[in-house]
Amino acid sequence: MPGVLTAAIPALPALLLGFFLMQTGNTFQGTILSIRGEIEGFTLAQIGAVGAGFWAGVIIGSLRAAGVIRRVGHIRTFASFGAIAGAAPLVHLLVIDPYVWIAARALTGFCFAAMFIVIESWLNAGASSENRGQILSIYGMTGLLAGIGGQLLLPTTDPAGFRPFCIIACIISLALAPIALTQGAAPAPPGEGSHVSLGRLYRESPLGVAAGFLGGVTTGAFFTLGPIFAEMRGLSMGEIAIFMACGTLGGFVAAWPLGLLSDRWDRRLVIIGAAAAAAASLTTMLALAPGDAYPWLLYLCVALFGGMIIPTYSLALAHLSDAVSQEEMVAASGGLLLAHGAGAAAGPLIAGFAMSATPRGLSYTLVAAQVLIVLFGVRRFFSRAAAPVAHKSAFAVEPPVPVGTEFAIAHSTPA
């Protein structure tokens, strides 16, 4: 790790290690809950609701976390919510009930929101204008790598047993150690922030808000019900793990190239192109990959799909930042994060009901969301000029759960 970054933020290695462990456990938990829910006889709509519960918890937690940090500080907030997040997976094991699982997953989302905000506010406080983009991009790429690692844990244990939940609890609990033991001083608690309504954001950047919401629908639905889709295709546990990991790997590989293109070209064209490619990859998978297809064909299609959908939020945020002033950016980011979180909560619910109606319900939901981005983007492209190059902000890779400091500060309420 570059010495200049650790000099700016001495706790950077500890923050990244804690974040890596958190995201590894969270990704593994999301996948195992979907598969275990099906084993336990949950309906697809109920499994979707469990996934939606996480994002509902993230939104609520983000509304409250900044106030808690202001009251007790970064390290105590992280340790307290981390302890609860480490215990929550065991609730799924102890009580096999879809409604209890929804509540437990929402509790996990609430705790993770607070933990993410602690890490992101710590990074933002130590970063300068010269290195902030680099630090946050390293943070985002760390989250993507952790997502890949979490998916690949699936074949190491039996999803019908108790061990997966114990492993998840251990991983999340271990995330507390690097940050709780760091010798670097924690930053000052975040201050109060301004608020920008979603209505105003939509007027300033309609495509940014729409892409943020629909991108949330897509990623929320895919990462909740993708394992069930793969299982219905006849894939083994190991193949399901590779299938899901390929989706995240595609995002890891494609994030920087898409970002560079968006910095040089009209961002709207990049957003439209990425959505069109995502829809095309899914359509190809439906047409050329029947249930008995070679797994590698599914891996290839899902890698392209993940490569196009995972950077959508980062592209939408960059597009939004081109339309608002620097002073309004924190509040505007919070509004976009709200739209993204709402979409990520709605996506699993919509896809769950769609899969209950037809085995291809997930694919239809994902394709529909991406086609809507394309249609809306084309409409906006011909109705408004592009942002001047001089006004374009730099692209930065966002983590897989992009709800953090900006949302918390812009929408925080007292603890």
Task: Enumerate the language-model features and the residues they cover.
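Structural signature of the two symmetry-related core transmembrane helices
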Residues: R76-V91, A169, L269-T284
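Intracellular juxtamembrane helix-capping segments at the cytosolic ends
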Residues: A114-A127, I310-V324
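Intrinsic disorder in cytosolic terminal tails and internal cytosolic loops
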Residues: M1-A7, P187-L198, R380-A415
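Cytoplasmic helix-loop-helix junction between adjacent transmembrane helices
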Residues: A106-M141
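Helix-loop boundary and gating motifs at the non-cytosolic
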Residues: T6-W55, G208, G220-F229, R233, ...
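Paired small-residue
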Residues: Y99-L107, W296-L304
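C-terminal membrane-cytosol helix-exit motif in multi-pass small-molecule transporters
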Residues: L154-P155, A169-P190, V374-S383
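Helix-to-loop junctions at the C-terminal end of transmembrane segments
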Residues: G61-H74, L154, D158, A254-D266, ...
